[in-house]
């Protein structure tokens, strides 16, 4: 998933998010990780596709959230180009944690007719993991016990035991962040 901010028709790439799901049939999102890894050539090709798509759709101001798929042959398919912030803690939390850019402030500034501020980019790793199962809860408890400094935000509830077939069935989430990519990635779904 690709996050951009636009001002006067100029599109600034902010973040690339890796998405984890349950797979078919529901594709319920289980986690997101930033920054996602992609080779530099593919990164530039996708930036070009997203920028041209934003132009074609007439998106000149504000946030945008784009979902694309790159197949094994390198073909890029557009799933969604939306004039909105990414949900599930992407726009509200992960972008700022991984880049240092106050995305929410920028969106508000643009809505008020003010140019968004420049920023000094920082590199950090962050993830949101959703609670769907007892295993997810066990991972949350293990982090809370052994690495509580990684937890940035949490909203965790008792697991109902019912199958999770949509995002609204999840029993909460926790956000972790740090400078060690592998330390964050090890808490993501396989």
Could you say what each language-model-derived stretch is?
Residues 1-76:
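Internal nucleotide-binding/catalytic subdomain
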Residues 26-27, 87, 164-169:
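Short, flexible turn/loop "capping" segments at secondary-structure junctions
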Residues 39, 43-46, 100, 181-184:
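Generic structural signal for well-ordered, non-membrane alpha-helical segments
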Residues 78-80:
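Pre-DFG segment of protein kinase catalytic domains
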Residues 106-190:
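Peripheral (often C-terminal) accessory segments that flank ATP-dependent C-N-forming ligase machineries
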């Amino acid at each position: 998933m690709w996050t951009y901010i636009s001002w006067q028709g100029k599109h600034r790439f902010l973040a690339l998010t890796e998405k984890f799901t349950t797979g078919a049939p529901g594709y319920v999102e289980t986690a997101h990780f930033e920054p996602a890894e992609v080779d530099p050539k593919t990164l530039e090709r996708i930036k070009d596709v997203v920028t041209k798509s934003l132009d074609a759709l007439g998106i000149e101001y504000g946030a945008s959230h784009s979902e694309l798929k790159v197949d094994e042959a390198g073909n890029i398919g557009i799933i969604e180009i939306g004039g909105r912030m990414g949900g599930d803690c992407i726009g509200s939390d992960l972008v700022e944690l991984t880049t240092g850019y106050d995305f929410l402030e920028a969106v508000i500034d643009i809505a008020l007719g003010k140019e968004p501020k420049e920023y000094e980019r920082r590199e950090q790793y962050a993830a949101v993991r959703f609670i769907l199962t007892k295993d997810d809860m066990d991972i949350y408890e293990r982090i809370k016990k052994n690495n509580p400094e990684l937890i940035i935000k949490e909203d965790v509830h008792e697991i109902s035991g019912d199958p999770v077939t949509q995002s609204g069935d999840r029993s909460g989430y926790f956000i972790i962040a740090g400078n060690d990519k592998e330390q964050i990635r090890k808490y993501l779904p396989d």
